[in-house]
Amino acid sequence: MSAPALSELQSQLSIEFKDQKLLYEALVHRSYVNEHDEAASHNERLEFLGDAVLELAVTNYLYQNFPLSEGELTLLRSALVKKDNLAAVAKNLRLGDYILLSKGEEKSGGREKNYLLANTFEAVIGAIYLDQGYAASEKMILEFLLPTLDTIIAENLHIDAKSSLQEKAQASVGVTPTYKVIEESGPAHDRLFIMGAYINDELLATGQGSSKQQAEQAAARIALVTKQWP
């Protein structure tokens, strides 16, 4: 990766690395190392470290700012650090433009894969932690990840809607909801699923997402509103 590209990314992150090699390593996917002898290390160790730093920073922020029970705080934290949310932040930062991939991974759309983007975001956090300490990595997390919390709370994305719908349906009509694929489209690396939530043969709602599980949760959230089951 060229020095200008690294400089451009640092400008987007509002940070300047003392050790540029750490940022470079954070962007190296395992597949790239297999094809390039000069890339001695990939980013999985940094991802491991960044995951821990991320969890601490998010946990501390939620504890300090939300007087909620442990269970409620855990739900919010899980929604913040889940792969799809981290991937969305990575896309906003255009991290996919800078990831170093093998030719095969590149062809399969690796730059758009949510899990790969999320892992790279965590690796960058780990690199910042090693280069500049906890305060700098926490600052990045608060600046780029925490703004997603408003949407999570407003849209109840931290709530397990499927469990709530099941409880309400069993209590009201004695039936467990089921889910069916209504439509599946898009390339392998960027699938879109539309799932329907049903009670018996009645379609309550449809929801969409990048995985069946995500689409089912979306359908369940809409079904709860449709049935007026708060």
Residue ranges of model-derived segments:
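Double-stranded RNA-binding/processing signature
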Residues: 1-230
